[in-house]
Amino acid sequence: MSDIIHLLPDSVANQIAAGEVIQRPASVIKELVENAIDADAQNIHVLVTDAGKTCIQIIDDGKGMSETDARLSFERHATSKIREAADLFALRTMGFRGEALASIAAVAQVELKTRLESEELGTKLVIAGSKVESQEAVSCSKGSNFSVKNLFFNVPARRKFLKANSTELSNILAEFERIALVHPEVAFSLYSNDSELFNLPVSPLRQRILAIFGKKLNQQLLNIEVNTTMVKISGYIAKPETARKKGAHQYFFVNGRYMRHPYFHKAVMEAYEQLIPVGEQVSYFIYFEVDPANIDVNIHPTKTEIKFENEQAIWQILSASVKESLGKFSAIPSIDFDTEDMPDIPAFEQNLPPAPPKIHYNSDFNPFKVSSGGSGGGSYSRPKVEWEGLYGGLTKASKMNEPQQEPEMDWENSPFEEEPMVAEEKTISAVSAASSTFSSASSTLYANESVIEKGNLHLQFKGRFILTSVKSGLMLIDQHRAHIRVLFDRYMVQIKQKQGVSQGVLFPEILQLPASEAAVLQGIMDDLSAVGFDLSDLGGGSYAINGIPSGIEGLNPVELVRNMLHTAMEKGNDVKEEIQNILALTLARAAAIVYGQVLSNEEMVSLVDSLFACPSPNYTPDGKTVLTTIKEEDIEKLFK
């Protein structure tokens, strides 16, 4: 048998390695911008065309490279950052593996212009698919100028799986923001299709945060700072009242590097546990400075997962520092020991006999004396109760749900026996008792009519469930979830057919977004318009909401659009279909009948019929149970 194992060509090996390092255009920008920072650049310009699919250009004023270094930098594992394994535990640079440039050159057409400050001429290098096409001297500025064109041109399968331009641009902006947040001492700019998205001058950290996410955040940030022999923690956390379900800006950085750390995230959120609703999040920008020997950066290709040697101790320090910051800025309830506004407490002399308290009273008052003239006397007459007024609103409300002609109810021969009331139930107010009686009578009446006319029983239980008999037993239907199921299917048809009805607003709402979110919003504008939203771009990340879908007048349109936007950013794949589902579900939840709403028999019948006309009546779009059936044999067992 002949030998079957052989070495792969460098070009193939580089393409395989690129699959880990270069996943999308944002990965290219991350690697090249980090290289520029390692080269001590003070100004970095990023230019992208078609969300980086056509061209990515990174221009910096860093140290630059010599002719030899420029050629060698595209070889695998060629780096200036480390020389031996021990250097991995003393890293102060962003890159160190020497894989990025080789991986980029393996799947794109790359042109590099670079010059050292001490040299008059620079070097121009052209590489495509790991093959050097040309290298020549050129006149250029100090630093480096990378141009990456036609990403994945030789890997069609990878290029085919790139997402929509809006999604890829959002990923680029996210990477750009992470780097800009950790290096406020560097000036950055970002252009997309010749449009300026960011122009960030050198500034303090707080100003850099506001420049990226908006000045509105300024009033929401609390300072956090603690310095120990193990770790130095600094940055900002948001006030509890700014919590939201989606869209919180949450960033951890360690030694100038962005990282994801679920364990430390729990430490931050634990401090907010009693201050914000369950399931909501707050923004934070937290920076760690740790001895490089106590962390391991080299455990993930993207270097975003970092292992700490003293993880549990740092968790405790982080949680305590967040709590301290919240308490210091009065973000949590605290005991006030300020005595400035306290009442004066008199000092009593000792050895004095106790004296009875002085009580002021009217010695001429006689409760049994009959008053004359009906005024100023001591008798008390109970005010007349206007009983009709108590039931006025109830009568009007009752008539709205009643049929045109209400038959007489035979109370004496009613088939239902009155349950004995316990003592606690008798304490209910007269109005509530009357309301319950009217509701019960109305439901009983409709039930009897249903039995007579259709032979099927529809009852409402606790203002939440609809009870109806089926062949196998008794079916319980959650009225709120059932209505969501029905409305969701209707809205989905409208969205897909672009038949959404828009209702104009008297005063347009203004939605202010950072650049990364604005890029995603541009990609889903058509889907928003299809369901009835009318948005206009005011520039600078500001959008005016001029119209909203009919039926959601009670909701905050800004928060509604923001929630759908953040969900689209999280999903990434199949954005259009996902947004359609989100829109339909959100609108269905907003317009659905609520728990406690009394339904007439006709309304219950209509809802049940509409539910079973749906393709999937058993569950809501988000997987919650709509109905359940109690089998007849199970009911019979209860009476054995």
Curated annotation (Swiss-Prot):
Q: Which GO terms describe its biological process?
A: mismatch repair
Q: Which domain of life is it from?
A: Bacteria
Which keywords does the record carry?
A: DNA damage, DNA repair
The keyword DNA repair is assigned to this record:
yes
Q: Name any one Pfam family assigned in the record.
A: MutL_C
Q: Which GO terms describe its molecular function?
A: ATP binding; ATP hydrolysis activity; ATP-dependent DNA damage sensor activity; mismatched DNA binding
Q: Does the keyword Magnesium apply?
A: no
* Record's GO cellular component terms: mismatch repair complex
Mind telling me which PANTHER family this protein's record contains?
DNA MISMATCH REPAIR PROTEIN MLH, PMS, MUTL, DNA MISMATCH REPAIR PROTEIN MLH1
By sequence similarity, the record places it as follows: Belongs to the DNA mismatch repair MutL/HexB family.
HAMAP family annotated for this entry? DNA_mis_repair
Q: What does this protein do?
A: This protein is involved in the repair of mismatches in DNA. It is required for dam-dependent methyl-directed DNA mismatch repair. May act as a 'molecular matchmaker', a protein that promotes the formation of a stable complex between two or more DNA-binding proteins in an ATP-dependent manner without itself being part of a final effector complex.
Q: What is this protein called?
A: DNA mismatch repair protein MutL
